[in-house]
Structure formats: C-alpha cells, structure tokens
C-alpha cells in the first residue's frame, strides 16, 4: 500500500488570519501569533522584576545610561570651566592703511575756463631718439705741494722696515645737469626702476634710464645670461614617451580604486567571460529563444520573465537563471584592451512568498586588437617623360569597312540619299564602360592598342614621338631545351632490389623461361 504524501500546511500568520474569525484556530497557532508561549511568558515576567536598561544592553538607545560614556584613563568633564589662553611670545604688527601721499594736480582747470577745445593741426612728431646733450662739469684735482716724509731707519741686525704714510686723497665734486621739455601730447615717466624689460600702456611712452647718453664709471651690475622667450609663431611639438591614448590621462590610483569596488570584485560579483560574438550586438539571444526585432535597441537594461512550470534551458549555459541584464559598460583592461561588460542578476532560488534570491554576475568580453597588415611591395612599371598615354582594349571600338557608294538598306526606297547624309553618326553611344580623363597643363595623347586573346606570347610596341619611354625587357621564351637519349641506350630502365650488382640489366637480355602447362 502506497503511503500518502504529507502536505505541508501554510504559515501560522496566514492560518491565523482565516481561522480567527471562525474560532477554529489550533492552540499552537494562537500562542505563536499572540506571543503567549512559555518562552514569551518567561521573558515578560522576568523583565518586570529585573531592569538592564541603564547598562546599555539589549534594545537601549546606546547613550550609555544616565552617566554617559567616559573614556578610560581620564577624569570626568568639568562643567563651567574656562580654557586657559596662552599669549603669543611675539607682538603682531599692527595692520592698517598705509600713509596717504598727496598728489599734485597738473594743469588745473578753472571754473571760468571755456569747455570748447580749439582744433589745431598737429605736426608729425619725431619719435626717434635724437641727440641728447649731456653737460658734465669735472673739477680737476687741486695741486698739493710736495712734502718731505721722514723715513725711520734702525741700525740693528734685523731686517729693515720702512714705514710709509699714505697720501691723503681730496674729495672730488661731480655735478650733472638735466633739461626737461614739456610736451602736452605725451605723458612721460622720468623715473624708472632698474629692472629688465619694458612695459607700456596705451597712449603712454615710458622713457627708462640707460637708453642714451654716456655712462661714467662702472655700471655696478653683473651681466646675467638671459634666455630668449619664443615668439607666438615658433613652437615645438614633443612626442610623449610612451605615446598616450588620451589627452587627459586618468590617475592610476583612482582607476585602481574604482576597479577594486566595481564589477571586478570577485568576492561579491561572479566573473564570467563570454566567447560568443552575439554578446556585443544581441545579448538577449543568449538568455532565451526569441525572434529578432530590428526596432528594439539592445543598449538598455533587459528584464527576462520566466515561469517555473515552463522551464526552458537558455541557448548559452552561462546565462542560466538570468532575470536582469544591464546596459553595456566600456572599460580598459590593464593590458590595454577594450572590455564590454554587462551586469546581470540571477534568480536561482524562489521562496513561497514570491521573493527570488540570486547572485550578481559580471559578463564581459575583451575586444582583440586590429593588427596592421604588412605593406605590399610595389614594382616599378617604367619611367616616362611625363606625357600621359591611355591604352584601350579591342572591346571599346570596332572598325567596319563600309562602302559608301553601295547602300543595301536603301534599295527599296525611291529617294536616293546624299553622300553627306551618310557621314552622320546616328548610332547610340554607350559610355557604361568608359573612363573620363581630365588632362592638366601638359598635352595628352591617346593611343589605341589592339589586344588579341591568344595563347601565344607576343610583344606590342606603341609608337610615340613626343615622350621617351624606358622599356624593361622580359624573358618571354617558353621553349626549353629537349634532351634526347642516345640511340644505343635502352629506353626503359627497370630498378631492381638487387644490391649485389653494380649495373642495370635490360629485360630483353634476361633468360626466358618456357611455361609448362599441365593438362589433366
């Protein structure tokens, strides 16, 4: 007798909802839902007598009780204490506005002055530097009468020592005069700082020191080797080593951090490499069997719904139980290849409540490099003087010998055609296989060379009187020297397996054996 299959009942929550109103609920379901079991009563009676809330145990707020959390090794916090302020050892400087320097007003305008400015013709001023007169009064050194300087000598046996007093040098006075002319058309800066370079504003001229005149004495500054600044038209382009693939390289640390917490995390996401090229264009065909829809774009996130009763294995085993397949993401591998990735979500386990549980899967495919083909070695066809020549085949034109006097097509007509009318070309031209050649400044010549389709080899020469062609001869002979055997040698040579002899024996020289037939 077959044993009946045990049917598992529904959860206690669902049974309690339906049987509570009817009053047919089992006791275990009521105790479990209403929390009246023995374990629940022990917790209720025990919590009424013992209170552990101040110790921060179980479901407290985490504030540490009434006293709060106190770090180990430190005293309590003083309430109302004042922090000690340490004065700085250095007195800071007073910050305030700088001294105001009075500015003199140049050419003040009186209230009674007319506001109308008369127009005058300004003569062209010479901006070139002219002769600057420099007046220097140099006073000569006054003459000083010579005086006898006493010389002290000693008579001891030591070395003689001469004590010479230095001559006093009188101070010299040098005076330099300067003359300045006022020009209302320009504003001149008469004082400048001894800096290298010159800067000017619009409608201003800066006159720096040292531009003219004579310098007496040393300049007092050392010459420093200066570097010339390149103009805006001169520039150099340096190739980076190694060549970069982007104008703004990404930091390696940031890229490694993103890669570690992204799709390549093997602890959280399963890594699956896809070899099928359909993954790049139509990844949905790897998950389920379906018809192609050209209006549907595969660049969006796809959701696949599948009933458990009608389970069908996907075309690719790696895409089993995949419910969600994300949009493509492009990245670069450490080896420099382009990677196309899609993040998928599996739905492997399904509970009775309808929740589905599954792992995340990273489907990726690395694109291979496009190898450059080897260059094709081109052969030199010939050298010419520059004149163009076109060689046409025999299919482009046809020559037919026609007698103009005889017209077999016009025999049935009474009207005789004029000989000039026969010169008109009424045929329809077909330019489907033609080539249009547009010449340049040089003259072009067209030559028609017939082409015969024959098995024999032949050479054709094009007559050209305008240019010079260099022809490279080629060996077109196909005949080979035929070696005929000597008449005294046999025509047929038979190789035998006999290794004892050092010659080949002709079959005609062998001894013939008569065949004996036995008759019954």
From Swiss-Prot:
A motif (Nuclear localization signal) lies at residues 1-10, 511-519. GO terms for biological process: microtubule-dependent intracellular transport of viral material towards nucleus; symbiont entry into host cell; viral penetration into host nucleus. GO terms for cellular component: host cell; host cell endosome; host cell Golgi apparatus; host cell nucleus; viral capsid. Highly phosphorylated. Its main location: virion. Keywords: Capsid protein, Cytoplasmic inwards viral transport, Disulfide bond, DNA-binding, Host endosome, Host Golgi apparatus, Host nucleus, Host-virus interaction, Late protein, Microtubular inwards viral transport, Phosphoprotein, Viral penetration into host nucleus, Virion, Virus entry into host cell. One of its GO terms (molecular function) is DNA binding. Disulfide bonds join 19-25. It comes from the Viruses. InterPro entries: Late_L2. Pfam families: Late_protein_L2. It is found in: Virion; Host nucleus; Host early endosome; Host Golgi apparatus. The keyword Disulfide bond applies. HAMAP family: PPV_L2. Belongs to the papillomaviridae L2 protein family. Interacts with major capsid protein L1. Interacts with E2; this interaction inhibits E2 transcriptional activity but not the DNA replication function E2. Interacts with host GADD45GIP1. Interacts with host HSPA8; this interaction is required for L2 nuclear translocation. Interacts with host importins KPNB2 and KPNB3. Forms a complex with importin alpha2-beta1 heterodimers via interaction with the importin alpha2 adapter. Interacts with host DYNLT1; this interaction is essential for virus intracellular transport during entry. Minor protein of the capsid that localizes along the inner surface of the virion, within the central cavities beneath the L1 pentamers. Plays a role in capsid stabilization through interaction with the major capsid protein L1. Once the virion enters the host cell, L2 escorts the genomic DNA into the nucleus by promoting escape from the endosomal compartments and traffic through the host Golgi network. This is Minor capsid protein L2. The gene is L2.
């Amino acid at each position: 007798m077959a044993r009946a299959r045990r049917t598992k009942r529904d959860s206690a929550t669902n049974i309690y909802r339906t049987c509570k109103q009817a009053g047919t609920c089992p006791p275990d379901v009521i105790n479990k839902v209403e929390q009246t079991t023995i374990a629940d009563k022990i917790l209720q009676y025990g919590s009424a007598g013992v209170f552990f809330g101040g110790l921060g145990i179980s479901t407290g707020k985490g504030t540490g009780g009434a006293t709060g959390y106190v770090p180990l090794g430190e005293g309590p916090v003083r309430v109302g204490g004042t922090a000690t302020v340490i004065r700085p050892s250095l007195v800071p400087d007073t910050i305030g506005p700088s001294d105001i320097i009075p500015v003199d007003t140049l050419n003040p305008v009186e209230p009674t002055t007319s506001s109308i400015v008369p127009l005058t013709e300004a003569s062209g001023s010479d901006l070139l530097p002219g002769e600057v007169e420099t007046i220097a009064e140099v006073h000569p050194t006054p003459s000083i009468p010579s005086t006898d300087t006493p010389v002290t000598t000693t008579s001891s046996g030591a070395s003689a020592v001469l004590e010479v007093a230095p001559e006093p040098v009188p101070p010299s006075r040098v005076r330099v005069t300067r003359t300045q002319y006022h020009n209302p058309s320009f504003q001149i800066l008469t004082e400048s700082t001894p800096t290298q370079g010159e800067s000017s504003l619009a409608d201003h001229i800066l006159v720096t020191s040292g531009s003219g005149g004579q310098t007496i004495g040393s300049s007092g500054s050392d010459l420093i080797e200066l570097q010339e600044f390149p103009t805006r038209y001169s520039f150099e382009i340096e190739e980076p080593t190694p060549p970069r693939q982007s104008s703004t390289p990404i930091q390696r640390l940031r890229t490694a951090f993103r890669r570690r917490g992204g799709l390549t995390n093997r602890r959280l996401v399963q890594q699956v490499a896809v070899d099928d090229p359909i993954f790049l264009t139509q990844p949905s065909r790897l998950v389920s069997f379906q018809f192609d829809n050209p209006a549907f774009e595969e660049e969006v996130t796809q959701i696949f719904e599948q009933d458990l009763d009608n389970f069908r294995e996907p075309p690719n085993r790696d895409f089993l139980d995949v419910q969600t397949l994300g949009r493509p993401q492009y990245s670069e591998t450490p080896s420099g290849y382009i990677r196309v990735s899609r993040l998928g979500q599996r739905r492997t386990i399904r509970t009775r409540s309808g929740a589905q549980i599954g792992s995340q899967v990273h489907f990726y495919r690395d694109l291979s490099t496009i190898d450059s083909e080897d260059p094709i070695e081109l052969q030199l066809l010939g050298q010419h003087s520059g004149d163009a020549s076109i060689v046409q085949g025999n299919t482009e034109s046809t020559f037919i010998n026609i007698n103009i006097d005889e017209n077999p097509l016009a025999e049935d007509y009474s009207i005789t055609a004029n000989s000039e009318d026969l010169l008109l070309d009424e045929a329809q031209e077909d330019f489907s296989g033609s080539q249009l050649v547009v010449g340049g400044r040089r003259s072009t010549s067209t030559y028609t060379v017939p082409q015969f389709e024959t098995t024999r080899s032949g050479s054709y020469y094009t007559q050209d009187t305008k240019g010079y062609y260099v022809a490279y001869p080629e060996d077109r002979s196909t005949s080979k020297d035929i070696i005929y055997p000597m008449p005294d040698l046999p025509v047929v040579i038979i190789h035998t397996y006999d290794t004892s002899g050092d010659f080949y024996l002709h079959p005609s020289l062998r001894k013939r054996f008569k065949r004996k037939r036995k008759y019954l």
